[in-house]
Amino acid sequence: MLFRSKASAGARGLIFGAFGYEPDHPEFNILRDEFLNNYERAICVNTRLFEGMSELLVQLESHQIAWGIVTNKLERFTFPLMEQLQLANRSFATIGGDTVGVSKPHPAPVLKAAEICQLDPSECLYVGDDQRDIEAGQAAGMATVAAAYGYCGSDLPIEQWGADFIIHTPKDLIPIVFGS
């Protein structure tokens, strides 16, 4: 749990958390490359969905509601992870941090996901566990949901991210989606 809040910032955040090294440190690139190679080899070791997420996805799918993944994680890691979690063939849109040439908080990745799902951004609900997610969703014209159960890497309290909703478990999304 020590590095949980750093995970949202990827290798950069984890290396800073462990060593205090910024990207301009002489050893940063060596450590980053070693970290990413090890991560790639063990992409799904001890990795699981948040409790209640499987049930939420089944409920969305049973109502034919498109869902997808927009992550700043590079495709090199995103697609194998989705395969191993058995989500690759279920996600309507999977967008990695390098899919569209920019990453969140830029709105382009979430707009690409909406395009793939053939939805207007105003019809989308973007759920994220980092302030960058909320900023990206808002910039794209989507309703936003802050997932307090996630990694939440921002220094700003989640209540100050400006999300339309805050949820504490995946099942908290159900009344937001279905209006009940």
Per-range role (PLM):
Residues 37, 58-61, 75, 79-180:
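Asp-based, Mg2+/Mn2+-dependent phosphohydrolase catalytic module
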Residues 4-5, 25, 29, 43, ...:
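A generic helix-loop boundary/linker signal
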Residues 66-68, 143:
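Proline-centered loop/turn at the N-terminus of a beta-strand
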Residues 49, 70, 102:
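Residue-level marker of regulatory loop/turn positions in helix-turn-helix DNA-binding domains and
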Residues 47, 69, 123-125:
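Residue-level marker of alpha-helix boundaries and capping positions
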Residues 7, 69-70, 128-129:
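Small/polar loops that bind or transfer phosphate-bearing groups
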Residues 1-55, 61-63, 74-76:
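N-terminal helical cap/lid subdomain that shapes the substrate entry/recognition surface
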